[in-house]
UniProtKB/Swiss-Prot annotation:
One Gene Ontology term, aspect cellular component: cell envelope Sec protein transport complex
Residues given in the record as ATP binding sites: Q84, G102, E103, G104, K105, T106, D496
Coiled-coil ranges per UniProt: none
Reaction(s) the record says it catalyses: ATP + H2O + cellular proteinSide 1 = ADP + phosphate + cellular proteinSide 2
Entry protein name: Protein translocase subunit SecA 2
Length: 796
């Protein structure tokens, strides 16, 4: 019933698109009759009309799409089909176009990119890896340039490349920019650490199209991009608390929900902790670090498994990517969790680096004035797209009907029986010369099957998501006659598999998947490797009760039935009851996995709200300071007065000696206290006196920064230094706070409420600290000049 309703709604959306498609098609003959010069002149005409506000992008769409459509035929030899135009209309509207593999998403994206770039603001195409960004840029660049727009790759595609001064500005100073989500995210964070307006390089984030949009803003939505700073002071609690955690009993001292990745102390567990560490209440503010490390140690012990989430290599904890199965050397969990795992495994603790800046992909793309996306599997994530981003998903019809045969799952009790059956099936298909693509969840499984096939004299290509460019070429050849390719689920994504000569008659590409993935969208993506553009094809998933998804997400007793695993697999295969039960178990496990992931993303989104609002305000203030060309109207007296008033109310400043010490610490290293006692009798008089000392010291520094340019740079540097130091402290504190409270959702406190409450309190304290640090920087900094007579500021 739900599918029927969804199909009806999609049909209604397609009908609305048809009206605009007709308008585009109506202009086809007109554009076809244009000379090259006349067609190229359209871009300048469109820009002028938009600039004069004679039209809008929506009104211009039919004409602009018809223009680039005709240009594409002349420059690239490709004329976008009607279904591609429909997908392009959906994306200009800011929604998600679901387009199947091989339907030409790369060409489709050129239309909304061209239209939105006509405003004079940059339009971005964002994809998942460097290879795809570079490939699509190189293919489409001639089209944009022929039409008079500039296009660039937003990075230099050389490993460990060091950018020259102003090189980033040149890369981003284009109408259309191709880049990746990771590179754009880090560029955004670094751009907002610039200490001079000329050092900033990102253009206005106006419009973006995200390729593989579900992978980037759903699956990776809660993955934070982090710029790490100086090492934190290492806590000596990890080893002590590791021993404490080992004394705790599940259900009595702590509760555990593996599916939701939650673990928290019970009331009795809190009492045990109070007694163990000899404190009245571990949740008092002074014991924040104690609670933080207890929670980290509980998570390390019960939610992270050796050889599944990480393994020990050369005395170090090396993380494993659960999706690809690849190890991630050099990558570390944040906020002390990595150190908690190291303590658990008894290896040397690595440095826990502080966090300088962070943002999630979810918040990154919300910075754009508008963004849209394209994917082959958007419909399955439609609810979440709408709930999180207010995006509709429109399923675009394929240009040719899909005739791929998606067979029922083959089910087994044991994994070794399943693996044996998979190898036999590959041999059987290979004997006919039909190409086979065997897809696994992990690199380890892919290597196993590849090795076994070689032992059986079946040559094969192994792709385990290591060399993207090389693997893209290999996956493209997977449709050739007699080809056998073994691949992880992530390898070669974004590359079409075209059928070689004689393969169509054999039934197209055969896709065998060795287990269901944790997300049904990924299953569908993998099946979609076969049967592109109306080609024949076949796909089948093999499952067993030993599969990861069953062990991780199912609580079915059937999965633990040891007697079942002794039954002849052929008999089980012939049992409709067994097949139905196993499919039901796998289906439910996948549903639990998807719901849990969705809840985790919702939770991450809630946690991200506070830091997102704070980050926007801090970066807005940074930009205001960078863009200020004259500080003569800046009210430093009020700033100083706020700080002095706060400090006199909250610090122990009661007598002459306290005031003198305060002046030495905050205002002047050369203060002379001759007449201090006669001038200050009340708090207001003390504040007035401190403001007087502030102005006196500031004037001394102005004698050194003795022209308008030096004064401007000094004020900017002093204020930005204060903002950056305190904001870095705030970000790091919020990261640690999140790790500390994240476990308490089912405990005595509401984790989100507590997090936002403390985040607001620490933000308000940060504002005072920024003001104080600004005053201190203005007064106590030492100003010198380098050999080029440029001002150098040595901060206190």
């Amino acid at each position: 019933m739900a599918n029927q309703v969804s199909n009806v709604i999609n049909s209604m959306r397609l009908k609305r698109l048809q009206k605009q498609l007709v308008a585009v098609n109506r202009l086809s003959d007109q554009m076809r009759n244009c000379s090259d010069e006349a067609l190229q002149a359209k871009t300048a005409d469109f820009k002028q009309r938009l600039e004069k506000r004679e039209t809008t992008l929506d009104k211009l769409l039919p004409e602009a799409y018809a223009t680039i459509r005709e240009a594409s035929k002349r420059v690239l030899g490709m004329y976008p089909k009607d279904v591609q135009v429909m997908g392009a209309i959906v994306m200009h509207q800011g929604n998600i176009a679901e387009m199947q593999t091989g339907e030409g998403k790369t060409l489709t994206a050129t239309m909304p990119l061209y239209l939105n770039a006509l405003t004079g603001k940059s339009a971005f195409l964002i994809t998942t890896n460097d290879y795809l960004a570079n490939r699509d840029f190189q293919e489409m660049r001639p089209l944009y340039e022929w039409l008079g727009l500039t296009a660039s790759l937003g990075f230099v595609d050389i490993p460990d490349y060091e950018y020259a001064e102003n090189e980033k500005q040149m890369l981003y100073n284009h109408d259309i920019i191709y880049t990746t989500n990771g590179r754009l995210g880090f560029d955004y964070l670094f751009d907002n650490l610039a200490d001079h307006i000329n050092a900033k390089y990102l253009p206005e984030l106006n419009f973006a199209i995200i390729d593989e949009v579900d992978s980037i803003i759903l699956d990776a939505a809660q993955t934070p991009l982090v710029i790490s700073g100086a090492p934190r002071v290492q806590s000596n609690l990890f080893h002590i608390i590791k021993m404490f955690v080992e004394t705790l009993v599940e259900d009595e001292h702590f509760k555990l929900n593996v599916n939701k990745k939650e673990v928290w102390l019970t009331d009795e567990g809190i009492d045990v902790a109070n007694h163990y560490f000899k404190v009245n209440n571990i949740y008092l503010p002074q014991y924040f670090d104690l609670v933080r490390v207890i929670n980290l140690s509980l998570r390390a012990k019960y939610l992270f498994k050796d050889n599944l989430d990480y393994f020990i290599y050369n005395g170090e904890v090396v993380l494993i990517d659960r999706i690809t199965g690849r190890m991630l050397p050099g990558t570390k969990l944040q906020s002390g969790l990595h150190q908690a795992i190291e303590a658990k495994e008894g290896v040397e603790l690595s440095q826990d680096l502080s966090v300088m800046a962070t943002i999630t992909f979810q918040n990154l793309f919300k910075l754009f004035n508008g963004f849209s996306g394209m994917t082959g599997t958007g419909k399955l994530g439609e609810k979440e797209f709408f709930d999180l981003y207010s995006k509709l998903v429109v399923e675009i019809p394929t240009n040719h009907p899909i005739i791929r045969n998606d067979k029922e799952d083959r089910v087994y009790a044991k994994s070794d029986e399943k693996n044996k059956a998979i190898l036999e099936k590959v041999k059987e298909i290979h004997a006919t010369k039909q190409p086979v693509l065997l897809i696994t969840r992990t690199a380890e499984a892919a290597e196993y099957f590849s090795t076994q096939l070689f032992k059986d004299n079946i040559p094969n290509n192994l792709l385990i998501a290591q060399n993207v460019a090389k693997e893209a070429q290999m996956i493209a050849e997977a449709g050739q006659l007699g080809a056998v390719t073994v691949s992880t689920s992530m390898a070669g994504r974004g590359t079409d598999i075209k059928l070689g000569s004689g393969v169509y008659e054999l039934g197209g590409l055969a896709v065998i998947i060795n287990e269901h993935m944790e997300n049904s969208r990924v299953d569908r993506q993998l099946r979609g490797r076969s049967g592109r553009q109306g080609d024949p094809g076949v796909s089948q998933i093999y499952v067993s009760l030993d599969d990861y998804i069953v062990k991780r997400w199912s609580n079915s007793k059937l999965a633990e039935n040891k007697k079942l695993k002794d039954v002849d697999p052929d008999k089980l295969q012939d049992s409709p009851f067994f097949r139905r039960r196993v499919r039901g178990i796998v289906s439910k496990a996948q549903r639990v996995s998807e719901e849990t992931s969705m809840m985790a993303r919702e939770m991450a989104n809630e946690f991200e709200k506070s830091i997102g609002i704070q980050r926007d305000r801090v970066y807005e203030e940074r930009n205001r300071i960078l863009e200020t060309s004259d500080f003569s109207a800046f009210d430093f007296d009020s700033l100083a007065r706020d700080v002095f008033d706060y400090d006199l109310r909250t610090k122990h400043i009661h007598n002459k000696d306290d005031i003198i010490n305060y002046i030495y610490e905050q205002l002047s290293f050369s203060f002379k206290d001759d007449a201090i006692s006669q001038q200050i009798q009340t708090r207001e008089q003390t504040i007035d006196y401190l403001v007087q000392q502030f102005n006196k010291q500031l004037k001394e520094n102005m004698k050194i920064a003795n022209n308008d340019y030096f004064k401007l740079r000094f004020f900017q540097k002093a204020i930005l230094k204060a903002i950056d130091v305190e904001w870095i402290n705030q970000v790091d504190q919020l990261q640690q706070l999140k790790a500390s409270v994240n476990n308490r959702q089912n405990g005595q406190r509401n984790a989100i409420f507590e997090y936002h409450k403390v985040a607001l309190e620490t933000y308000e304290m940060m504002l005072i600290n920024i003001k104080r640090a600004t005053i201190r920087n203005l007064c106590l900094s030492i100003l010198t000049f380098d050999k080029d007579q440029d001002l150098v500021v040595h901060f206190p």
